[in-house]
Amino acid sequence: MAQNTIDHSFSLGGSRHMQGQEEVPFQTNKGSSKICLVHGNLDIWVKEAKKLPNMDMFHKALGDMFSKLPMKVSRVSNNITSDPYVTISLSGAVIGRTFVINNSENPVWMQHFNVPVAHHAAELHFVVKDNDVVGSQLIGAVGIPAEQLCSGKKIEGTFPILAANGKPCKPGAELSLSIQFTPVQQMAIYKHGVGSGPDYNGVPGTYFPLRRGGKVTLYQDAHVHDGCLPDLKLDGHVQYEHGTCWLDIFNAISQARRLIYITGWSVYHQVRLVRDGHDGKDCTLGDLLKIKSQEGVRVLLLVWDDPTSRSFLGYKTEGIMNTSDEETRHFFKHSSVQVLLCPRSGGKGHSFMKKQEVGTIYSHHQKTVIVDADAGHYKRKIVAFIGGLDLCMGRYDTPQHPLFRTLETVHKDDNRNPTFMEPGVGCPRQPWHDLHCKIDGPAAYDILTNFEERWLKASKPHGIQRLKASYDDALLKFERIPEIIGIAEVSCQAENDPETWHVQVFRSIDSTSVKGFPDDPKDATSRNLLCGKNVLIDASIHTAYIKAIRAAQHFIYIENQYFLGSSYNWDAHKDIGANNLIPMEIALKIANKIRANERFSAYILIPMWPEGVPTGTPTQRILFWQEKCWILTPIGGQEALCLGLLTYLFH
């Protein structure tokens, strides 16, 4: 009999951002404010603050001591004062942060925020803090009543920054703000569906723009046998072709002439992409990549570095996530294939504990394969595969999802089931259902840009690594290779071609993982980046989700391995930090449709439990948090009704 495994840790591939909590420990307005539903967008300008107190009292004491020293030393010490920044919070959830301005009691930010919100709140809080090496100190806060926000009037002016005693934190201390709330019902962008047609410009406020004239191939699972799925007719009586994902990836890698760039949560060299006896294609991914590198193709692998797997002086630890990252690196060690193991890192200036949390709990979860392909006329173009399938063990599956009958054939050396300690006799394999796609066209170059930004960041040497060879020159310089056409030259599908796709790339990543974001945080807004504490954030995938849900007219369909969010509105554990708006937006969408007496359906498909031991502490914790998403604290009978429907769907 197979045995249950011991409890093991889990790794979340999502972003840690939009997860901050900011509870103001004192009242910022006299009396109690009315709780309102603030659902729409907040357009905010945090302009400047004046006459802030000096919170660096230690440095102030040093300054007093050094004032008796020569003029130059005295002048330097007296310049040390508060390093202020502002957090914006609603219902206890941080929805925005300014950048830090060092050594200023009169900081000028002039920073703009356009934030989607779906919160029950009494006040919008602006909390002014002093950034310190060991954390931050509260200077004071400004509270704007939610009822005043929802009046529709623009709020603009200077507001006293209050301390815990209800008085200004310093005489004359004030914060200059401009706030305009727009309810979701008044936003034209959501009234005509998700968007299509020649006038559609994509999701606004994102890092990558909409790219027109591409071609997309969709895949269900790693492989689809002929005839195993129903025939589907598309518009214009076009026959839909079910794709063969891993076979197409194998062929694309085999036909590459210049580059093969791969990212993954896990990339395992022993995995076989093609099975069922395809002639000449029965080789492992590792052997295939070595062959291509020997042909002169630049092969780069960017793989998440599991902090629990290590290889040092011949001693190896497999790692609790079983990603085989060290084994894959060792396999390619003496080849021309370059492998970078990339850990998740905390932001500059984050505390030691925060950095440990980020490195342990979160992972890099992108899965991309980028190759050059034939573009005709002796030219090459960029093609990218992207989606949910890692090139590792346990991922090869078909829509039939067999549990036992393939254990001696296509899954003979690939029986992975982390529900059990060892896949002994009678142990079924774990089926794996996921989606993937191939992008051919201008958007593929954005996926290439993502890889280059990540590679340049991950390859930057630190500490003793500076003595080793640099990886900076590993990326191909396309301006020196005229054979590879650029994004401006790539041919586009005609607008009226039924196979034409307009594609926009979204992601969740920050400046600790990419190189290329602005050095000056003041430039973040122009690149549609959010500002965290000492970090810039691309949260475009969250922006896209919100836009799609708000614009949906008839239904929402979601498949995901996890479903966590809107913890600021849970009935308990509000401080868990899963502050994305997705569950709340779905609940409000259904409530609005009920009020309008319009039919609407939300289909949310998640596993019975995510990968791992169902009785293990990490899995039970995730299941507990997921249940909280279905019992969001309702306010109003119609919301209670729609949330009850969601609970019914879940169970």
Residues covered by each model-derived region:
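Short secondary-structure subsegments characteristic of cysteine-rich extracellular domains
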Residues: D279-I291, K574-L588
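HKD-type phospholipase D/PLD-like phosphodiesterase module
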Residues: Q3, S11-F26, H39, M55, ...
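Eukaryotic endomembrane contact-site and trafficking scaffolds
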Residues: K30-V38, D43, L52-M55, T87-S89
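Short amphipathic, basic-aromatic surface patches that mediate peripheral association
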Residues: T28-K30, W45-N78
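Active-site His/acidic residue clusters
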Residues: G565-G577
